[in-house]
Design a protein with these regions (language model features):
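C-terminal structural segments of small proteins and small subunits
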Residues: 62-90
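Short S/T/G/P-rich N-terminal loop/turn motif that feeds into the first structured element of a domain
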Residues: 1-53, 59-66, 70, 93-95
Length: 95
């Protein structure tokens, strides 16, 4: 079943550290079945707290999504992301 990972950037705390995350996350995608659907496109919050940006990634199934998220390369990228911003990450299965 298709599975999606949704990331919302709640607050940037250190832009220089966050800038290092992008290349690391890109490298971590190699060898994984993921499709970016939304990458910081124009957005509008209709309910809830404001966000700075949204990323939505599509995976063929939950196992593939968690395999990428917990991979050594993305774990290192994620730790870098934590140095530069506060995010919310959600995994959700599609229909």
């Amino acid at each position: 079943m298709a599975t999606y990972m949704i990331f919302t950037r709640e607050k940037t705390t250190n832009q220089a550290e966050l800038d290092k995350y992008g290349p690391m996350a890109g490298a971590a995608s190699a060898g994984h079945e993921l499709t970016p659907l939304v990458v910081y496109g124009k957005h509008e919050v209709l309910e809830g707290a404001p966000t700075e940006g949204v990323v939505i990634l599509s995976f063929p199934n939950r196992e593939a999504a968690l395999g990428w998220y917990n991979s050594p390369l993305y774990t290192a990228a994620r730790e870098q992301r934590f140095k530069g911003a506060e995010y919310r990450a959600i995994i959700v299965e599609g229909i």
